[in-house]
Amino acid sequence: MFQNATDWTPTSTDPRDEQFGGVVEPVPTPSDADDYDAVLVGEPYDGAVIGRRGARDGPSAIRESLAGVKTHHFDAGAVSGVADLGDVVLPDGDVADTQAAVREAAAEVHETAALPVFVGGDNSLSYANVAPLVAADNGAVGVVSVDAHLDCRAVGDRGPTSGTPYRQLFDAGLDALAVVGARHFETTTTYAGFLRDQGGRIVTSDAVAADRDGSLDAAREALDGVDHVYVSVDIDVLDAAYPGASAPTPGGIQPRELFALVEALAASDDRIRGFELVETAPTLDTGGRTVDAAARTIAHFLAGAQ
């Protein structure tokens, strides 16, 4: 079910430069992650992406970048207690087969004592990562999706895509969704109306830029009644200056805003049950800037969660 992770190696030769490459430890099975605070899981798949492909290379590139990031956070201290379960072994087949395999793997990861950190891969796998929490019937589940798009498209003849995960999750029983960083002119009236009909909250990228803390409060308010919270980041929430994504467009948020959002969510809410970062496409990037932003987003989330 999992292809074991390779050993992590720091990029610095100075032993005082404690980096994630010297802290993250590979583990062979989900049960071995119980001794850690968080566990990384790679999902190298982009067969369902609507736009440009390349996200299948995201997990390996993000790991490589994260290995060279120092673990010290000025407020939270040094990040530690992180395992790496490796990549989910994906089947040959259609998107539905892939979602089923990832869902089975994600269910095992959610049963561990460690906080799951899924590294994609395309946005279609958000359904597979969250569905086990919904199916557990152990309380209401809500998602904070930090994304330029709503991803509430109906599943059509093509089957599931990177644009359908939250429609699939609502159909499965998801209780609440807040989309933070959504961009004007990136969705349709139909899908915006669908999300609002479900009681969802849309917080635009303009709102994040004008009042980051207020935007975070709006997202929390939308999830006020749930018992479990899952946080999803689609890297295309960043401005098009960070081009290593399937669908970069102008008007996105800045990395500093993204880092602060995920760190605050992780630090202030004990209902967090998982995190994912999706749609990073290294082959579409310029100078590794998007990959580096993705790696540091994970670092900030881990700092907030500890």
Swiss-Prot record:
PANTHER family from the xrefs? Answer: ARGINASE/AGMATINASE, GUANIDINO ACID HYDROLASE, MITOCHONDRIAL
Q: What does this protein do?
A: Catalyzes the conversion of N-formimidoyl-L-glutamate to L-glutamate and formamide.
Among InterPro entries, the record links this protein to: HutG (IPR005923), Ureohydrolase (IPR006035), Ureohydrolase_dom_sf (IPR023696)
Region annotation (Disordered) maps to 1-36
Q: Which cofactor does it need?
A: Mn(2+)
Q: In which pathway does it act?
A: Amino-acid degradation; L-histidine degradation into L-glutamate; L-glutamate from N-formimidoyl-L-glutamate (hydrolase route): step 1/1
Give its E.C. classification number.
3.5.3.8
Q: Which residues bind Mn(2+) 1?
A: N123, D147, D151, D234
Under PROSITE patterns, the record lists: ARGINASE_2
Please report the name of this protein according to its UniProt entry. Formimidoylglutamase
Quote the cofactor binding remark: Binds 2 manganese ions per subunit.
Into which family does the record put it?
Belongs to the arginase family.
Q: Which reaction does it catalyse?
A: N-formimidoyl-L-glutamate + H2O = formamide + L-glutamate
Which residues does Mn(2+) 2 bind?
A: D147, H149, D234, D236
Positions the record marks as coiled coil are: none
GO terms for MF: agmatinase activity; formimidoylglutamase activity; manganese ion binding
* The entry's keywords: Histidine metabolism, Hydrolase, Manganese, Metal-binding
Q: Does the keyword Nucleus apply?
A: no
List the biased-composition ranges (Polar residues).
1-13
Could you tell me which species this protein originates from?
Answer: Halobacterium salinarum (strain ATCC 700922 / JCM 11081 / NRC-1)
Q: Which Gene3D superfamilies match?
A: Ureohydrolase domain (3.40.800.10)
- Output the GO biological process annotations, alphabetical, semicolon-separated: L-histidine catabolic process to glutamate and formamide; L-histidine catabolic process to glutamate and formate; putrescine biosynthetic process from arginine, via agmatine
Lineage per the UniProt record: Archaea, Methanobacteriati, Methanobacteriota, Stenosarchaea group, Halobacteria
Pfam families, alphabetized: Arginase (PF00491)
